């Protein structure tokens, strides 16, 4: 049975402006759960929890495996380091002060520190070994995207269109690059990435930018999408996906825009294809895997931009970004299912219902296992048999 959802309702609950907000008469139809003959069944190694999770709020708050620990956080401010062997808590820290912490951007683990952003406009830094709070700085706008730490800096991309760099040790602001933000944008921002002293990020105005980390000097900008249409909704062109770097090329995709391959040094386009998405992509080095605005899962040849396969059976199931685990593409959805697709064909290989409350972010790899966190904060470490 297909589930019919109001676009306006989706916007109200914030799952996504990914569908755009329209009149009450506009509806989308969520595809039913596909019938899959499972080729394998993952086993659960242990379970744990992290507060109340992120609830029904928009969130890309993602766990991280680093320093032989699993780091997780909840929207209301609880941060934990877990033992990957048994899920037991090594340390925990409550970041709530006068108001709910509203953690939203992260987690980032670098320099022996945990960097987390919040909807309250804060960048918070903890000691990764002890959980001790080291420093906390205010920024103009929400921090919805994962911070980036490189070259001794930690950088955040805010909802006001600013990329701000702080000294990773002291929290002192070093530089800021600002961009114009349209009146209406999607919920979410592009997490910056870096290589060879350069930082790259997408903007709400439909452009991709590059800057020199050491100076905060803008190097180039490249349009990914051009506003079209009569209404502000039609003219949404946010580039919310985090750029993806493969060799000498950089890949990005925009909402109502294009999937584009760029020369990393010059920013000049190598090829463009008509795909619309606000989700991060993944790659196995030869292929790009993306989820479109309609939740179609697509594989594209990274060299030429040729579409290799497309799976449309999960349409409007509010998928997470695609994750590569072994020879599979793994996606979770808003009804709490994990879907496993064959990397070469896009065909279903397995499916599990993890939690009916839904899953907001992709699973992560933990050595030869993987970790799933539900919207309500339940944590499962699992392994393919």
Swiss-Prot record:
UniProt KW Nuclease keyword: no
Keyword Cell cycle part of the UniProt annotation: no
Signal peptide: 1-20
Naturally occurring in which organism (per UniProt): Aliivibrio fischeri (strain ATCC 700601 / ES114)
Protein name (database record): Outer membrane protein assembly factor BamB
Covalent lipid sites (S-diacylglycerol cysteine): 21
Location relative to the cell: Cell outer membrane
Record text on subunit structure and interactions: Part of the Bam complex.
InterPro entries in the record: BamB (IPR017687), PQQ_b-propeller_rpt (IPR018391), PQQ_rpt_dom (IPR002372), Quinoprotein_ADH-like_sf (IPR011047), WD40/YVTN_repeat-like_dom_sf (IPR015943)
Pfam family, any one: PQQ_2
Gene assigned in the entry: bamB
Principal location class: membrane
Membership in a protein family: Belongs to the BamB family.
GO BP, one annotated term: Gram-negative-bacterium-type cell outer membrane assembly
Membrane-protein topology: Lipid-anchor
Role description: Part of the outer membrane protein assembly complex, which is involved in assembly and insertion of beta-barrel proteins into the outer membrane.
């Amino acid at each position: 049975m297909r589930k019919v959802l109001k676009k306006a309702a989706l916007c109200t609950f914030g799952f996504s402006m990914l569908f755009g907000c329209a009149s009450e008469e506009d509806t989308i139809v969520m595809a039913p759960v596909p019938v899959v003959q499972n080729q394998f069944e993952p086993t659960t190694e242990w379970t744990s929890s992290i507060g109340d999770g992120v609830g029904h709020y928009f969130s890309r708050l993602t766990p991280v495996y680093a320093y032989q620990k699993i780091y997780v956080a909840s929207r209301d401010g609880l941060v934990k380091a877990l033992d990957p062997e048994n899920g037991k808590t090594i340390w925990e820290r409550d970041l709530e002060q006068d108001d709910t912490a509203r953690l939203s951007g992260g987690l980032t683990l670098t320099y022996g520190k945990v960097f987390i952003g919040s909807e309250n406009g804060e960048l918070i830094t903890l000691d990764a070994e002890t959980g001790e709070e080291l420093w906390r700085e205010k920024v103009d706008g929400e921090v919805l995207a994962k911070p980036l730490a490189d070259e001794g800096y930690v950088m955040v991309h805010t909802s006001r269109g600013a990329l701000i760099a702080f000294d990773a040790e002291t929290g002192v602001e070093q530089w800021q690059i600002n961009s114009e933000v349209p009146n209406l944008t999607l919920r979410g921002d592009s997490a910056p990435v870096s290589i060879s002293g350069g930082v790259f990020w997408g903007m709400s105005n439909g452009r991709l930018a590059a800057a020199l980390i050491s100076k905060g000097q803008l190097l180039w900008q490249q349009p990914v999408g051009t506003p079209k249409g009569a209404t502000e909704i039609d003219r949404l062109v946010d580039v919310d996906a985090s750029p993806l770097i493969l060799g000498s090329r950089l890949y990005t995709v925009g909402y109502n825009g294009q999937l584009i391959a760029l020369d990393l040094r010059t920013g000049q386009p190598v090829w463009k294809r008509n795909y619309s998405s606000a989700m991060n992509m993944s790659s196995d080095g030869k292929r790009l895997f993306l989820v479109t605005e309609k939740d179609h899962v697509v594989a594209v040849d990274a060299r030429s931009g040729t579409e290799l396969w497309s799976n449309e059976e999960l349409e409007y199931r509010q998928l997470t970004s695609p994750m590569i685990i072994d020879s599979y593409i793994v996606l979770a959805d808003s009804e709490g299912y994990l879907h496993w697709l064959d990397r070469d064909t896009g065909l279903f290989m397995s499916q599990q219902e993890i939690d009916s409350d839904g899953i907001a972010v992709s699973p992560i790899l933990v050595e030869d296992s993987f970790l799933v966190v539900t919207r309500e904060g339940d944590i499962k470490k699992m392994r393919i048999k």
